[in-house]
Design a protein with these regions (language model features):
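Alpha-helical transmembrane-bundle signature of multi-pass membrane transport and export proteins
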Residues: 1-407
Length: 407
């Protein structure tokens, strides 16, 4: 094998090793999560007609990231990530099984939904940060981009294209069935992760007197000092504010001009499907885009094209335009996410990836609800197509913030 062939081989993750099991666990788990997240709002709406209470279920899914996101990253850097992940999935599986029993027996309440959403996301803060930190131990550095692309493509396909359409059929079989399926996927994912054969993580000894609080502060300080990571985190946060504005009002944008009912629902479903399909295709091509342009330029290119898509959606209020724009937007969204995550994994100092990932995720989650509020206010004040233009402005700022890295 020539040197060129060796490098090319190392740039592709080996399915036969631990990566294949991690990929399967991630895809299976996303499938179950998507069943639950599609079914929970329907259950909440059947329990109360108070929109504030229904929205509170979603809010409880965000809150733990703001409260415990950085803590989850610090813990992920301290522990054996593999063990933490399968233990968390077993606990989440047990919680979902208990919740499924409560639904089957007719004991579900809004209070129970709030507690469940908060508990699951609290556990997710540790799981997601540990998963990001574990991946570089399973694949060579040269294969990180391809591995991230395959993970995101599989998750997008399972969650966006497979799970959501199944929910109505599963609910016909019983109100508890989606939650039983979610519990089963957690257990299966835990078994797959537990079967990984990775050595104990090698970390430098912690200084005397080191605490989780000090380690969280150290992670933020490292992010602030690293110029590429700092600007990349800034750009990602701005984009997530824009995404919050777009997604929160997308149904109003798409159904504007349709009568309430099947026509509007079909238009909205077609738009979401186009976005998911674009995201899946983007996963297949994200690494190739980076190979041609460089990783940071791939991120900037993705943001630039997404800005154009948002301007088009806001300026041309036609359903066909929205569907096409969302397909391209989803494509470039995966290109951004794959290369942003890979850059973060490549640049984070050894033993600090969990904390760096936690800072990215915490700021991203904080941006989404802020964007949703801004998007709602824009739609109420200036019409249903204004949030897309607001999102375009935020994406343009994000791309501009990357200019120092490109130059």
């Amino acid at each position: 094998m020539t040197a060129t062939e060796t490098v090319a081989a190392r740039a592709v993750p080996d399915w036969r090793g631990g990566f294949g099991r991690l990929w399967t666990a991630a895809v299976v788990s996303r499938f179950g999560d998507s069943l639950r997240t599609a079914a929970l709002p329907l259950l909440a709406a059947s329990l109360t007609d108070d929109p504030l209470l229904i929205a509170s279920v979603t809010a409880c899914g965000f809150l733990p990231w703001l409260l415990f996101g950085l803590l989850g990253g610090a813990v992920a850097d301290r522990v054996d990530q593999r063990r933490a992940m399968w233990a968390v999935d077993l606990v989440r599986g047990a919680l979902m099984a208990a919740f499924a029993v409560a639904v089957a027996l007719g004991h579900a309440t809004i209070a129970l939904l709030l507690v469940l959403a908060f508990a699951l996301t609290t556990l997710q803060t540790l799981f997601d940060n540990a998963a990001t930190a574990l991946l570089p131990a399973l694949v060579p550095t040269e294969a990180l981009a391809a591995a991230n692309a395959r993970l995101m493509t599989g998750q997008q396909f399972a969650g966006g294209l497979l799970a959501a359409p199944l929910v109505p059929a599963l609910l016909l079989a019983g109100d508890a069935v989606p939650y039983v399926a979610d519990a089963a996927t957690y257990v299966l994912a835990a078994l797959l992760i537990a079967s990984l054969r990775t050595g104990a993580p090698e970390r430098p000894p912690r200084p005397a007197g080191s605490t989780l609080r000090k380690e969280m502060t150290e992670g933020l300080a490292t992010l602030r000092r690293d110029r590429p990571l700092r600007w990349l985190c800034t750009a990602t946060t701005l984009c997530n504010i824009g995404m919050g504005a777009l997604i929160a009002t997308l149904v109003v944008h798409v159904t504007d001009g349709h009568q309430a009912g099947s026509a509007g629902n079909a238009a909205y479903a077609a738009t979401l499907t186009a976005y998911a399909v674009g995201g899946v295709i983007g996963g297949f091509l994200a690494r190739r885009v980076a190979e041609r342009t460089g990783r940071i330029r791939a991120v900037a290119l993705a943001g630039t094209v997404q800005t154009g898509c948002l301007v088009l959606m806001g300026a041309v209020p036609a359903l066909a335009v929205s569907i096409a724009a969302m397909a391209v937007f989803g494509f470039m969204g995966t290109v951004w996410n794959v290369n942003q995550t890979t850059l973060m994994q490549e640049r984070a100092p050894e033993g600090m990836l969990g904390r760096i990932a936690a800072a990215f995720r915490t700021l991203a989650v904080a941006g989404a609800p802020l964007g949703a509020l801004l998007g709602g206010a824009a739609a109420a004040g200036w019409g249903p197509h204004t949030p897309a233009l607001l999102a375009a402005a935020l994406f343009a700022l994000a791309v501009a913030s990357l200019a120092p890295l490109i130059n």
